[in-house]
């Protein structure tokens, strides 16, 4: 009996590890649970990217369905996502606000002048503290809020046309239909 256990124990351990590996490989890396889903957006007041003497706050994003896109000029994926954000903004189906994250103001302003500006307004989060309040892991990330300012969706990584068509636009339409 002890002889069989000596061979059975490594087999059981191997099967357990193989099962854990299979489970880990089947997870979608874009799906990271956020404790903020279903909760009010964090309270914030930040200077505008375009004017350091003016501010934008969480109250500016309430009363309508909005998207908040966290981006930076140092973020390679943000550049790939930018064209898709411009297309989404042109549809007029959602107001997109930006949060420029841990960046240099002049670099970010130049970026928007050269590539186009899909945002209604841009908050400037130079030190990243507001991004931390939002649970940001890195850029880009996009949040969708309902009319009451409740976070309903978080997308990690660059948005694609497929993401917008299959995830965001149906969600936005559903949120717009709510009272």
Feature roles, as predicted:
Residues 64-66, 70-74, 138:
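Short pre-active-site segment immediately N-terminal to redox-active cysteine/selenocysteine motifs
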Residues 113-118, 125-176:
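Thiol/disulfide oxidoreductase modules built on the thioredoxin-like
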